[in-house]
Amino acid sequence: MIIKPRVRGFICVSTHPTGCEANVREQIDYVKARGPIANGPKKVLVIGASTGYGLAARISAAFGSDAATLGVFFERAGSETKAGTAGWYNTAAFEKFATEKGLYATSINGDAFSDEVKARTIEVIKRDLGQVDLVVYSLAAPKRTHPKSGEVFSSTLKPVGKAVNLRGIDTDKEVIKETVLEPATQKEIDDTVAVMGGEDWQMWIDALLEAGVLADGAKTTAFTYLGEKITHDIYWNGSIGAAKKDLDQKVLGIREKLAAKGGDARVSVLKAVVTQASSAIPMMPLYLSLLFKVMKEKGTHEGCIEQVYGLYKDSLYGAAPHIDEEGRLRADYKELDPEVQNRVQELWTQVTNDNIYELTDFSGYKTDFLRLFGFEIAGVDYEADVNPDVQIPKLVQV
């Protein structure tokens, strides 16, 4: 079938298998061109491995450090008549290229919050790898079923304590709009912490430690975004911020446990990029469009693969890691450059319906958004017939 982008709100409901493969190849080529990561990881578990930062973490480990990788995610296969999810095609492509290079690559498809997926992951590590020396936690999910109580929690994107008026772009109509977000209730805050906080990361590490599948000296990192004052009402000071603060608390206990084995645990702060998660946040398309404009002009613009490869090389496995006073690894320092933030802040109030394309890089934002789903990739023939039924040969389905 011939597949074209079909966008509804902040989701593209179609995906292009060939485009997703080309996108993965571009990221692999970037890592290969930058050269190997000195003293990098060799056996890596990535939880949330199929898109965005998690996929970049898997690619960087495999092609920057010749690592065996095990990826966990929750994706949907395609059929002859219906496209699957982008993460499915990304993984099929990644496994194909990793196998061609002679690298171990296996994937587990299921709910990473569940005990079943944790148990199955441990089985596969024991069978194939023995132990892992890096665990990357990169889950982005709107809901979580608690593995012990069975309670279902939903995350909420709201301010805390006061209503907030946010500027943003209506990405369908391409106009500036103001959105009023009412404050979260205590239950909404608690539920957001249950979904996006550090409990599941801690459960993963505890399960891996108990099973004896974490190598001596093993590291773990969880990815997060903090942003600057322009996004603070909705991030750091909002319901999501409560979850991020929980992550900062939970990492201390995880670090202590791993330190006993000569290892380490860190929260890694990455820059704002276009992802399926960020496009759902009312102000982010406008913020990202302005950020892209300013950072591209400065020559400091980066996407997922540049960020994560840099995080591995400079901080996770570098001699002089970028670390803040809270002990977090920072890869977002180019975004937080005061010159960049001040310029974004200046432009923030100047943007109108008439000058969106002039003052912002909204066209770059739209391209990046479509690239998530395998569209707008150079060299791909979008008029060609494509089969959406793509297999992942080494998939473990839970």
Curated annotation (Swiss-Prot):
Pathway: Lipid metabolism; fatty acid biosynthesis
Group of enzyme by EC: oxidoreductase
GO annotation (BP), single: fatty acid biosynthetic process
Positions that bind NAD(+): 48-53, 74-75, 111-112, 139-140, 244, 273-275
Key words, A-Z: Fatty acid biosynthesis, Fatty acid metabolism, Lipid biosynthesis, Lipid metabolism, NAD, Oxidoreductase
Marked site positions, Plays an important role in discriminating NADH against NADPH: E75
Active-site residue list: Y235
Catalytic activity: a 2,3-saturated acyl-[ACP] + NAD(+) = a (2E)-enoyl-[ACP] + NADH + H(+)
Enzyme Commission number(s) from the entry: 1.3.1.9
Residues involved in substrate binding: Y225
Family: Belongs to the TER reductase family.
Quaternary data: Monomer.
Function: Involved in the final reduction of the elongation cycle of fatty acid synthesis (FAS II). Catalyzes the reduction of a carbon-carbon double bond in an enoyl moiety that is covalently linked to an acyl carrier protein (ACP).
Protein name (database record): Enoyl-[acyl-carrier-protein] reductase [NADH]
Source organism of the structure: Paraburkholderia phytofirmans (strain DSM 17436 / LMG 22146 / PsJN) (Burkholderia phytofirmans)
Gene name of this polypeptide: fabV
